[in-house]
């Protein structure tokens, strides 16, 4: 499954994995998964977190290692119900629910994920996605960026 990923995607997922793997031991625990999900405004129960881990925990050790994480991401990318996932992701970024992601909202979510970005980097991310040039990202622009990955 993970064989279909490009080197660039694998590098991106490695970076995402390290955001989850707070103590850097190469495994994501339910506690670490919960921390990241809560920073994104989600509030999963302990049982839901365990289910998420069990879903991809191939060796049954109760944690997710990087190869298991890659398989999960490869599966998610193939998933046909990605429309709903994109809407959900957009809602996470669009804090005030006005239908647009502003630079401030993007910075807020990225900071919660542990990404320390300069104002220039945030502005650059907005510019890359902002097709109509209004300084913020609407849903269509967001989908284009996410699908291009």
Curated annotation (Swiss-Prot):
Binding sites annotated in the UniProt record for Ca(2+) 4: 130, 132, 134, 136, 141
KW Repeat (keyword) present: yes
Residues involved in Ca(2+) 1 binding: 21, 23, 25, 27, 32
GO MF entries: calcium ion binding; enzyme regulator activity
Coiled coil: none
Entry PTM: The N-terminus is blocked.
UniProt protein name: Calmodulin
Protein's organism: Spinacia oleracea (Spinach)
């Amino acid at each position: 499954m993970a064989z279909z990923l490009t080197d660039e995607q694998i590098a991106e997922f490695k970076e995402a994995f390290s955001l989850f793997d707070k103590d850097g031991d190469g495994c994501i625990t339910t506690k670490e998964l919960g921390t990241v999900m809560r920073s994104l405004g989600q509030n999963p129960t302990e049982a839901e977190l365990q289910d998420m881990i069990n879903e991809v925990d191939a060796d049954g050790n109760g944690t997710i290692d990087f190869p298991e994480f890659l398989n999960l991401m490869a599966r998610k990318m193939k998933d046909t119900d990605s429309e709903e996932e994109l809407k959900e992701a957009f809602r996470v970024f669009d804090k005030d629910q006005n239908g647009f992601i502003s630079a401030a909202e993007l910075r807020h979510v990225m900071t919660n994920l542990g990404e320390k970005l300069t104002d220039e980097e945030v502005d650059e991310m907005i510019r890359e996605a902002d097709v109509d040039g209004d300084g913020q990202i609407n849903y269509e622009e967001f989908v284009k960026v996410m699908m291009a990955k």
